[in-house]
Swiss-Prot record:
Keywords: Cytoplasm, Elongation factor, Protein biosynthesis. GO terms for cellular component: cytoplasm. Its main location: cytoplasm. The gene is efp. It is found in: Cytoplasm. SMART domains: EFP, Elong-fact-P_C. PROSITE patterns: EFP. It comes from Rhodopseudomonas palustris (strain BisB5). This is Elongation factor P. GO terms for biological process: peptide biosynthetic process.
């Protein structure tokens, strides 16, 4: 489907010269003189090459049709990440380029949304929050309840984050999968 360049947003998938590109960032620039343009940073899905394009805001570009479906994460091996569609039990393999920074948060049997173009996965959406265990941090310091300072910690998936002073090793915490930031102590 053809759309004007100014309507392209991060996460959209474009089709150019028979190849698919996922939009990393899109910015509309309105100079004082001259024609407004859309500056678009994209990554080619087939090989991960980053491309920067500049279009007039009124130019037409081809937006690929994408279908979002729930998949269950099975396992990771040297070839990539393997997911299963729960209703048909069809398995799909997703490359490391598509999974990107989401890889540490993937847990066995986790339900994620895969954006599919035909039979190719082009993007992954994790649940907003993940519950993980703190495996390394400074010892709990008594009497530091008034300050809002955070201390560094390493979680069970290897991600570094900052936690409040009262959180110790072995504590289960809830973090945002988008950036790994601490939300709260787990209630389990």
């Amino acid at each position: 489907m053809r759309v004007i360049a100014s309507s392209i947003r991060k996460g959209n998938v474009l089709e150019q010269d028979g190849k698919l590109y996922v939009v990393l960032s899109a910015e509309n620039i309105h100079p004082g003189k001259g024609t407004p343009v859309s500056q678009i940073e994209m990554r080619r899905i087939s090989d991960g090459v980053k491309v920067s394009e500049r279009y007039k805001t009124t130019d037409q570009v081809e937006k690929a049709t994408i279908e979002e479906r729930n998949y269950t994460f099975l396992y990771e091996d040297g070839e990539g990440f393997h997911f299963m569609e729960p209703e048909s039990f069809d398995q799909v393999q997703v490359t490391k380029d598509v999974v990107g920074n989401s890889a540490p948060y993937l847990a066995e049997n986790m339900v994620v949304k895969l954006s599919m173009h035909d039979t190719t996965a082009v993007a992954i959406t994790l649940p907003q929050r993940a519950t993980l265990e703190v495996v390394e941090t400074e010892p709990v310091t008594k009497g530091q309840t008034a300050s809002s300072s955070y201390k560094p910690a390493i979680l069970s998936n290897g991600v570094r984050t900052a936690v409040p002073p009262h959180v110790g090793v072995g504590t289960r915490v809830v973090v945002l999968t988008e950036d790994g930031s601490y939300v709260e102590r787990a209630k389990d």
